[in-house]
């Protein structure tokens, strides 16, 4: 099936521009240097699957004219990946009397349920709450004829999910990739990887480390995401191999799912 991936956000947890920062990237006139928190939308066969609800989801949805979602997948529970959950309200209302399904690994699902009790506990059923249903995910999932396979990655000291779907994979927030996960990254047309900056970080990959991952996984094309203000878009792209680029907010890629 033909599918389209839209990069809703390509930035790090603080976004770019970063509050109070006077660096050149934060004051850049290049729109590619404006980076909201990391998320992608996958569309195929009239369906739409979102990966992560960032604090910028409302802005991202308005920018991309998102009017429909059929499922949401969560990579993990850090603030920059879940805090936009309440902004699912207007889209989730379109699912009534059904609820919009949200999928997360079991430990993440429990965390989300506890953090947003007003959404999930019956005693809080008042007002216009998001009409969503949280479902634990511990293996491959078929959504509307497409297979979404969790790809475990290491984020600091925590195991979280990336996802493979068809000929594409999206891995964000990783400091290491387990040996067993490389088997899930073979034969890719598109691979998204975390590349925060050049300087080492305890929970995120660097540009140099992600280039080594590209050399091993051998996708046709690779795109870096979760980018901080240390990496100017155009200048950094000039240093990368021809099949590797920084992603940017609003980027659209077609692939087979």
What is each residue range found by the language model?
Residues 1-171, 180, 237-256:
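Binuclear metal-dependent hydrolase catalytic cores
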């Amino acid at each position: 099936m033909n599918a389209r991936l839209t990069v809703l956000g390509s930035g790090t947890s603080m976004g770019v521009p970063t509050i109070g920062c006077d660096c050149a990237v934060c004051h850049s006139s290049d729109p590619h240097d404006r980076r909201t928190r990391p998320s992608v939308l996958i569309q195929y066969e009239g369906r739409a699957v979102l990966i992560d609800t960032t604090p910028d989801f409302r802005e991202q949805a308005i920018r991309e004219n998102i009017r429909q979602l059929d499922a949401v997948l969560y990579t993990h529970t850090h603030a920059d990946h879940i805090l936009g959950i309440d902004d699912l309200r207007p889209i989730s209302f379109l699912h009534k009397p059904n609820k919009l399904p949200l999928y997360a690994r079991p430990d993440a699902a429990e965390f989300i349920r506890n953090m947003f009790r007003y959404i999930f506990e019956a005693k809080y059923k008042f007002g216009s709450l998001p009409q969503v249903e949280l479902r634990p995910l511990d293996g491959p999932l078929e959504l509307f004829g497409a297979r979404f396979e969790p790809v475990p990655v290491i984020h600091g000291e925590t195991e979280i999910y990336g996802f493979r779907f068809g000929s594409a994979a999206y891995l964000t927030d990783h400091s290491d990739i387990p040996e067993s996960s490389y088997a899930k990254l073979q034969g890719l047309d598109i691979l998204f990887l975390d590349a925060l900056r050049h300087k080492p970080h305890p929970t995120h990959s660097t540009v140099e480390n992600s280039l080594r991952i590209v050399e091993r996984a051998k996708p046709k094309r690779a795109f870096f995401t979760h980018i901080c203000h240390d990496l100017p878009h155009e200048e950094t792209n000039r240093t990368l191999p021809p099949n590797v680029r920084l992603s940017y907010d609003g980027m659209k890629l077609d692939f087979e799912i």
